């Protein structure tokens, strides 16, 4: 994977085993900083103070299932979100979050699937960056046109 920069990652999971495993999939040269939190409330506070490129949520969380957090992150930021849910809940959760842009992965899973989904999120994040850059350019041109029109 060749990148010009590293992706900031927020991992939200109550499982120490999962947290250790996912950290092994996030080498610093591609993913930095990596912040690990164990509950939705802490994640919400963190997201108010810092922005992240990728958010990985391993459900359930001790204070919230995690689906609402995933939806909120997608609705309020450009971060890519990976939501891991038990296989018996996958179809219901997927149907509720796909419209917001959340990528859902059923558990149990393996390291390769998580790694592949993280790469998909990186590609999606790059696409989002390109769109944001184009939008900024268009907005700047609109400002210039308005300024010229006022001068006339």
Predicted regions and their residues:
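C-terminal output/effector regions of signal-responsive regulators
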Residues: 136-152
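Alpha4 helix (beta4-alpha4-beta5 surface) of REC/receiver domains from two-component response regulators
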Residues: 68, 87-104
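C-terminal output helix
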Residues: 109-118
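Conserved acidic segment of CheY-like receiver
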Residues: 5-17, 22-26, 36, 55
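Short hydrophobic/Thr-rich beta-strand motif most characteristic of the beta2 strand and flanking loop
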Residues: 31-39
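The C-terminal output helix
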Residues: 119-132
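Conserved phosphotransfer microenvironments
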Residues: 19, 43-44, 54-74, 88-89
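A short, hydrophobic beta-strand element within the central beta-sheet of small alpha/beta folds
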Residues: 78-88
